[in-house]
């Protein structure tokens, strides 16, 4: 007898360890687990820990050649989800040795790569991860971060303004550049390639880059402000992506852009390193995120994708608007906005933050609010997101009845009015509409915008009751 007992044994005998004291170096995960009928939660939780670390479906002879206690994931705590039948939050601790340094790709392949198709589970969602400082320190993180970006742009004390150029597909490069110029001239800080603008037959990437750069330099000369356009470098191969970023750098632009989920974490991390080495800011779009994060009980919550982006690298990331959505979503959106910007985030279950997360000086990421917002939302956005954010008005700029430049003027005037009012100690939540109305007396462009998008009622009371 060699001490090897073949056969299948329950996962919970090895991987469910409720007495385990987590280590400071462990990666901790919170999963929302819905077991199949008849599968006890301990077995389901242990199965998740096993299949995402050292386990397989049967005992194997080679288990004896390693120290499983050192390398196995452990399910160390299970709590039922209030108000849900047969749903549990399962906490799993992974030893740091299971992960390659500086690789978001490897971290995800290990933690979520295999276990989601597991038969014993009906559905599974990764709600949060605690990344230990020992692992955070193996990542470069965002190319520059919030403070360096402000210094590069010479813009302080207010949110930054952006606009996605529409129609997103079909414009020629020259007309696209015209639209960029009008927006920047009117007072925006940035314009943006749509996420699916890459290099299509009607507008090849190189032509677009050249005409957009012409627009940037012309607008800078006229306004005396630094301007940028998020040149989307996303491409079919990593080499082509870097080639586009290199060309952007040669043109002297301040910022490029990447779709980090469709482009992939490996490509994104490479681009992020290139951007830091070459002084480019990196704007990140989250195209495809809803495929992964939309279902409440299956997939990966966006806060995990946001943490992963901060590790992989990006200076801006789209993070929803909060305005007009349900209150619970508001708190949760604020939760991952804080995770993106701050250096140390306390556990706060009301915001969906399952673990205290120290970032040990990893640069922060600016959250980008974009999607269906216009001048009447400005007070709410200023109040909710604060100065360190990018507010992006696509239709809210280009839909102005007088054209792009007046649309940009309207947004800039509204923003400056809100920032001034806030600095004077006024209550943006209560007086928001009044502030915008008053400012529109001095700005015909803003008055016209206010007329088009008529006052909206802010669902804004809940902010104070967090």
Curated annotation (Swiss-Prot):
Residues that bind Mg(2+): 192, 194-195
InterPro entries per the UniProt record, alphabetical: RuBisCO (IPR033966), RuBisCo_large_chain_AS (IPR020878), RuBisCO_lsu_C (IPR000685), RuBisCO_lsu_C_sf (IPR036376), RuBisCO_lsu_fd_N (IPR017443), RuBisCO_lsu_N_sf (IPR036422), RuBisCO_lsuI (IPR020888)
Site (Transition state stabilizer): 325
Residues recorded as bearing N6,N6,N6-trimethyllysine in the entry: 5
CDD domains the record matches: RuBisCO_large_I (cd08212)
Listed EC numbers: 4.1.1.39
Post-translational modification N6-carboxylysine, affected residues: 192
Catalytic activity from the UniProt record: 2 (2R)-3-phosphoglycerate + 2 H(+) = D-ribulose 1,5-bisphosphate + CO2 + H2O; D-ribulose 1,5-bisphosphate + O2 = 2-phosphoglycolate + (2R)-3-phosphoglycerate + 2 H(+)
Binding positions for substrate per the UniProt entry: 114, 164, 168, 286, 318, 370
UniProt record, GO biological process: photorespiration; reductive pentose-phosphate cycle
Record's signal peptide: none
A cellular component annotation (GO) from this entry: chloroplast
Cofactor: Mg(2+)
Cofactor binding note: Binds 1 Mg(2+) ion per subunit.
Highest taxon of source: Eukaryota
Pfam families found in the cross-reference section: RuBisCO_large, RuBisCO_large_N
Keyword set, alphabetical order: Calvin cycle, Carbon dioxide fixation, Chloroplast, Lyase, Magnesium, Metal-binding, Methylation, Monooxygenase, Oxidoreductase, Photorespiration, Photosynthesis, Plastid
NCBIfam families referenced in this protein's UniProt entry, alphabetically: PRK04208.1
Assembly description: Heterohexadecamer of 8 large chains and 8 small chains.
Additional free-text comment from the UniProt record: The basic functional RuBisCO is composed of a large chain homodimer in a 'head-to-tail' conformation. In form I RuBisCO this homodimer is arranged in a barrel-like tetramer with the small subunits forming a tetrameric 'cap' on each end of the 'barrel'.
Protein name: Ribulose bisphosphate carboxylase large chain
Gene from which this protein is expressed: rbcL
């Amino acid at each position: 007898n060699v001490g090897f007992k073949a056969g299948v044994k329950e996962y919970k005998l090895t991987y469910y360890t409720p007495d385990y004291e987590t280590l400071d170096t462990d990666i901790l995960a919170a999963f929302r687990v819905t077991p199949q009928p008849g599968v006890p939660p301990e077995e389901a939780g242990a199965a998740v820990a096993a299949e995402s670390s050292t386990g397989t479906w049967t005992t194997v002879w080679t288990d004896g050649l390693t120290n499983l206690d050192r390398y196995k994931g452990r399910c160390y705590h299970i709590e039922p989800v209030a108000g849900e039948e047969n749903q549990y939050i399962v906490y799993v601790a992974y030893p740091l040795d299971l992960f390659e340094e500086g690789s978001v790709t490897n971290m995800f392949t290990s933690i979520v790569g295999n276990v989601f198709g597991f038969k014993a589970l009906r559905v599974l969602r990764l709600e949060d991860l605690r990344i230990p400082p020992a692992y955070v320190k193996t990542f470069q993180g965002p190319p520059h971060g919030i403070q360096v970006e402000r210094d590069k742009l010479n813009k302080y004390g207010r949110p930054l303004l952006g606009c996605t150029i529409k129609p997103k597909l079909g414009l020629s490069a020259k007309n696209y550049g015209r639209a960029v110029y009008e927006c920047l001239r009117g007072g925006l800080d940035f314009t943006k390639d749509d996420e699916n603008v890459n290099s299509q037959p009607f507008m090849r990437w190189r032509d677009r880059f050249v005409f957009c750069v012409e627009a940037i330099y012309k607008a800078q000369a006229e306004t005396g402000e630094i301007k940028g356009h998020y040149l989307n470098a996303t491409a079919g191969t990593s080499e082509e992506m870097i080639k586009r970023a290199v060309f952007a750098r040669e043109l002297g632009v301040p910022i490029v852009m990447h779709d980090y989920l469709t482009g992939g974490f490996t490509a994104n991390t490479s681009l992020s390193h290139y951007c830091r080495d070459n002084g480019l800011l990196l704007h990140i779009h989250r195209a495809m995120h809803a495929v992964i994060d939309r279902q409440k009980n299956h997939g990966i919550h966006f806060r995990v994708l946001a943490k992963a982006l901060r590790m992989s690298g990006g200076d801006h990331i789209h993070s929803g608007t909060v305005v007009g959505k349900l209150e619970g979503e508001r708190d949760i959106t604020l939760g991952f906005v804080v995770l993106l910007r701050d250096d140390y985030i306390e556990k706060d279950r009301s915001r969906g933050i399952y673990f205290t997360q120290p970032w040990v000086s990893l640069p922060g990421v600016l959250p980008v609010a974009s999607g269906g917002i216009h001048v009447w939302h400005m007070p709410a956005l200023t109040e909710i997101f604060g100065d360190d954010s990018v507010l992006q008005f696509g239709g809210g700029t280009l839909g102005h009845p007088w054209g792009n430049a007046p649309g940009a003027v309207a947004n800039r005037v509204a923003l400056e009015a809100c920032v001034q009012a806030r600095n004077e100690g006024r209550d943006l939540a209560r007086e928001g509409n009044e502030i915008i109305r008053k400012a529109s007396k001095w700005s015909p462009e803003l008055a016209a915008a206010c007329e088009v998008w008529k006052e909206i009622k802010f669902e804004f009371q809940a902010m104070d009751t967090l």
